[in-house]
């Protein structure tokens, strides 16, 4: 295959990640792009930018430009410009924070406004994050699915902390944008391999109960 033919199989997609500041957008983008989870919360101011190249069926190489938009930009003048030209939009909320789910109406209204003013109609995906905290869930799956059905969103549930379904979410979005259907084997192959950190701690007397600090990692195949 010539260089020009190889280049023709390379695609670039702009994926914009929107949602409230505590929904875990940055952790989601970082987990996908760098396969790590940031344990310390750091609010995104304005815009963060991530890149990752993936391969879809048919040996199609796709570079995803992930635009992590700060939660405070919802009323800002730059938000329209950040969204403009996106092929995909992830609306991210925290499944344990009902307000973060309700606020997606405001985020989506901006997406619709930009779409009407541009020639690009992005694929919109609804992403429920922090499913590792299922016992603290306040947004029922039925609510999530109804919102998807009413607006034609694709549906995803992930955990940026454990890495559960993070890569699969981005892979599915990219494939749907490009009109590529993933088969069951490809989906299963993209599922996260569960791993555990080894936590080292000092020896303590047997009479004392030791609760070492818990650690988490994001591992993506």
From Swiss-Prot:
InterPro entries for the chain: P-loop_NTPase, Small_GTP-bd, Small_GTPase
Signal peptide: none
UniProt region (Switch II), positions on chain: 68-85
Phosphoserine PTM sites in chain numbering: 8
Catalysed reaction, written as an equation: GTP + H2O = GDP + phosphate + H(+)
EC number annotated for this UniProt entry: 3.6.5.2
Cofactors that this protein relies on: Mg(2+)
Mod. after translation: Isoprenylated.
Catalytic EC class: hydrolase
MF annotations from Gene Ontology: G protein activity; GDP binding; GTP binding; GTPase activity
Keywords: Acetylation, Cell membrane, Cell projection, Cytoplasm, Cytoskeleton, GTP-binding, Hydrolase, Lipoprotein, Magnesium, Membrane, Metal-binding, Methylation, Nucleotide-binding, Nucleus, Phosphoprotein, Prenylation
Highest taxon above the source species: Eukaryota
UniProt keyword GTP-binding present: yes
Modes of activity regulation: Regulated by guanine nucleotide exchange factors (GEFs) which promote the exchange of bound GDP for free GTP. Regulated by GTPase activating proteins (GAPs) which increase the GTP hydrolysis activity. Inhibited by GDP dissociation inhibitors (GDIs).
Record keyword Iron-sulfur present: no
Binding positions (GTP): 21, 24-27, 38-39, 41, 44, 71, 129-130, 132, 160-161
Positions bearing Cysteine methyl ester: 218
Region (Switch I) location: 35-49
Family per similarity comment: Belongs to the small GTPase superfamily. Rab family.
Protein role: The small GTPases Rab are key regulators of intracellular membrane trafficking, from the formation of transport vesicles to their fusion with membranes. Rabs cycle between an inactive GDP-bound form and an active GTP-bound form that is able to recruit to membranes different sets of downstream effectors directly responsible for vesicle formation, movement, tethering and fusion. RAB28 is required for shedding and phagocytosis of cone cell outer segments (OS) discs in the retina. Also participates in nuclear factor kappa-B p65/RELA nuclear transport in endothelial cells.
Name of this protein: Ras-related protein Rab-28
Protein source organism: Bos taurus (Bovine)
Top-level taxonomy: Eukaryota, Metazoa, Chordata, Craniata, Vertebrata
Gene: RAB28
């Amino acid at each position: 295959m010539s260089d020009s033919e190889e280049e023709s199989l390379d695609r670039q997609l702009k994926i914009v990640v929107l949602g409230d500041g505590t929904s875990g957008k940055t952790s989601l983008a970082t987990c996908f792009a760098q396969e790590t989870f940031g344990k310390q919360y750091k609010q995104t101011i304005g815009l963060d930018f991530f890149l990752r190249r993936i391969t879809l069926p048919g040996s199609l190489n796709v570079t995803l430009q992930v635009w992590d938009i700060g939660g405070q930009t919802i009323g800002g003048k730059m938000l329209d410009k950040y969204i403009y030209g996106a092929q995909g939009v992830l609306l991210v909320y925290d499944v344990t924070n009902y307000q973060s789910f309700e606020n997606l109406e405001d985020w989506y209204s901006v997406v619709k406004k930009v779409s009407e003013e541009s020639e690009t109609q992005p694929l919109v995906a609804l992403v429920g994050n922090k499913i590792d905290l299922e016992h603290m869930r306040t947004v029922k799956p039925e609510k999530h699915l109804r919102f998807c059905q009413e607006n034609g969103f694709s549906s995803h549930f992930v955990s940026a902390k454990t890495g559960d379904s993070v890569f699969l979410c981005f892979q599915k979005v990219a494939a749907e944008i490009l009109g590529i259907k993933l088969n069951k084997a490809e989906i299963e192959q993209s599922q996260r391999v569960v791993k555990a950190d080894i936590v080292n701690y000092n020896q303590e007397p047997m009479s004392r109960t030791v609760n070492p600090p818990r650690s988490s990692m994001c591992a993506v195949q």
